[in-house]
Regions:
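Flexible glycine/proline-rich, aromatic-decorated loop/lid segments
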Residues: 50-51, 167-183, 190-208, 250-273
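Alpha/beta enzyme core
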Residues: 14-23, 36-157, 173-180
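Structural signal for hydrophobic packing residues in well-ordered secondary-structure cores
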Residues: 20-27, 46, 50, 54, ...
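A mid-to-C-terminal "edge-of-domain" accessory segment
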Residues: 204, 210-338
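Histidine-centered catalytic micro-motifs
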Residues: 157-164, 171, 185
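Metal-centered catalytic cores of metalloenzymes
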Residues: 136, 143-149, 173-174, 193-204, ...
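Short, ordered loop/turn segments at secondary-structure junctions
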Residues: 5-8, 31-34, 58-61, 99-101, ...
Length: 338
């Protein structure tokens, strides 16, 4: 779990402290700059955690070092080493991130990673902070940094991707392919700007493609839909209907050809078992629906129709659906009995 932690944000501080005192199995992490006040606040907030982690970060790209931090690379290197060592004395483990890694020089990133590992970092995170990389570029970047810094093989390599180009999940999965043991993601993909990699999409992809990725998680995916709804309600961020895995339409089949196939065998148009993510498959009725789905809806409503009655009712339904789009199932009963 990742939270911003600094004294200038009392709400974040209390949030971290509350989570740390409540959860039992997960490692609780607080995010901190390479600033002693941040590090002290993070350690204090994590005091009640069963297992605590401070996540230290500093930018390594030229534009960030020059324009945002006003620091020379040598000073960035010094701060990274010092902050990790300081944090390692106060919590169970330390994670270190090179902010804006994908726009950084791989050789410099390797040097900073080596310094962080030598100072005590157990997890090293190489973020695509602005969603700049393509999947093959991100995988290649991680592999190149690890080639230049063999010490990375002694720690957990982590991926953190943003969705500015809609590639956060693809990039995260590409990272898993080249050995990332941790992927940072969020429920519903919420996050800065266009968001972060979507937890539900990554979890289900790794579950379905376990042999392909040779990786697995301990996520209980049957609770994913409930978690998505809870996060949506608490944040006010509406989940788009066509969102993969958790969108309202993710397991809804309206097209007649698809509905016919689904009624015969759900594997025809569905690669994810809805029960695996805590939802049900639906066959909504609309102008693209076919006779088989309509007949199924009538049967589900307890109506017993002769072939002629079914044909007449289906014609009335299609006329209604052609003008109104989706047709609630209760309206089918009205149309049939009219």
């Amino acid at each position: 779990m990742l939270f911003r932690s600094a004294r200038r944000s009392p709400g974040d501080f209390e949030g971290v402290r509350s989570v740390a005192a409540t959860v039992e199995r997960p490692t609780v992490a607080a995010l901190a700059r390479t600033v002693q006040d941040d590090l002290d606040a993070a350690a204090e907030a994590l005091a009640g955690a069963r297992r605590s982690r401070i996540h230290v970060f500093i930018a390594t790209s030229p534009v960030h070092m020059e324009r945002k931090l006003g620091l020379e690379p040598s000073e960035v290197l010094r701060q990274a080493r010092g902050a990790v060592a300081y944090a390692a004395e106060r919590v169970d483990e330390v994670e270190f991130s090179c902010e804006d890694a994908t726009r950084s020089d791989p050789e410099f990133v390797a040097r900073v990673c080596r310094a962080a590992i030598e100072a005590g970092a157990a997890v090293v995170n190489l973020p695509d902070t602005v969603g700049w990389a393509m999947p093959h570029e991100y995988a290649g970047f991680l592999a190149e940094v690890r080639r230049r810094c063999p010490e990375l093989r002694r720690v957990v390599l982590s991926a953190h991707c943003h969705d500015d180009l809609g590639l956060a999940v693809a990039n995260s999965l590409a990272a898993v392919q080249v050995g990332a043991g941790q992927v940072e993601c969020t429920v519903n993909g919420i996050g800065e700007r266009a968001g972060n990699a979507s937890l539900e999409e990554i979890a289900v992809a790794l579950k379905l493609k376990r042999d392909y990725f040779d990786a697995e998680t301990r996520i209980e995916t049957e609770h994913i839909a409930a978690a998505s709804r809870l996060v949506s309600r608490l944040t006010g961020y509406v989940v788009q209907p066509n969102k993969a895995v958790v969108g309202a339409n993710a397991f809804a089949h309206e097209a007649g050809i698809h509905q016919d196939g689904m009624l015969k065998d759900e594997r025809t148009y569905q690669i994810i078992d809805p029960k695996d993510v805590g939802v049900r498959m639906t066959l909504p009725l609309g102008k693209h629906s076919g006779r088989h789905a309509f007949a199924r809806a009538c049967a589900d409503l307890g109506m017993k129709l002769t072939p002629d009655e079914l044909n007449a009712a289906f014609r009335r339904f299609k006329a209604l659906a052609d003008t109104s789009g989706a047709v609630p199932v209760e309206d089918v009963f009205v149309e049939v009995t009219a």
